[in-house]
Amino acid sequence: MRILIIKLSPIEAITSSMFRTLAIARGLSEAGHKIDYLVVPMNKLNSASSEKEFIKELNVIRTSKSEVYEKNVINAENSFKALRKQILRKIWHSLSVYDYTYLIAKKIKIDILPVREYDIVISSSDPKSSHIVVENLRKQGLRYKRWIQYWGDPLSIDITQKSIYPQWVLRLIEKKLIKNSDKIVYASPFTLSKQKELFKDYKDKMVCIPTAYMEEEIYPATDNQKFIIGYYGNYTARVRNIKPFYNACRALGDKVSVAIYGDSDVKLQATPNIAIYDRGIVDEHKRIADLLICILNSSGTQIPGKLYHLAGTNKKVLVVVDGEQQQEMREFLLSFDRFYVCGNSQEEIENAIVSIMKDNKEFLPLPELKYDYIANRFIE
């Protein structure tokens, strides 16, 4: 089949949503399907990952840049322009439910595509403007047999949403976005349940398919003098609470060596046993780590894609559950027989780490989350 995947992010970017979409693309490509992959170019705000070899098998199509956004928000070099950039970004994100790629989505022309007819079109968010591209191209003559929407955070229950609009307005916008699709895929069973409740007219085309990991990562056994722990991901205060984990690691002292990588508005102080880094490449640290940490969101229904990527390793993984559905999430995660799980309190985390340090259990990547298996489920 010929398949068009639309993901208005740079294909080189280090984001969970890009990784989960690329996992689908890889699985479909290796199954023999021809993939056109529509993305936006890199800009100065993006962090680049190392390019995956299989990307060369995709026909990557890059849109033009948003000149208005590039000029006024991205390319600010002196202090005045930098301040203006910060103000303009805040204004934009408060007045719009989309990011800057909305401008690209509305102006995109069908001539950018090599063909005008596909067996399947997949639009993947975030950003949510990826779905707008399909509607725009439909009006210009795009034809397809099925349109599958792949959602990360739904619009109206997105805990990272900074828009000034009330929930009922966001739901109207979201309803308009999903109504013409043939299939809607969510990565969390809790998100699926909530969306079926909110959009009853479209519940029959909604499904939950877990996020796929893109590569199996098998590491040799470690022989560290100290127990090495890695946390890799952003930890913005309004999304997840990293303080209990941080405090637990401080309390454990020289029993553990901890590295925290990620962007945040929370200022954590480095200690003799805890190193703090900005977001970046973590491959080398992951190789030597004894335990990987995933902290779930403080509220909402989403499960971070990072959790599933960690399931593609043979490392021990501790998932710290939080929010109003802790018990349900705990039961769901334990059903995989792959993760250690605890609540988000210093005491629980500290006790869990001490217990894991004594546990000799070994793990392998979960086959039911591998990219080829998930990609096949995706287009069923």
Predicted feature residues:
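A conserved catalytic-core segment of Leloir-type glycosyltransferases
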Residues: N43-K106
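N-terminal subdomain of nucleotide-sugar transferases
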Residues: M1-K65, K183, C249-L252
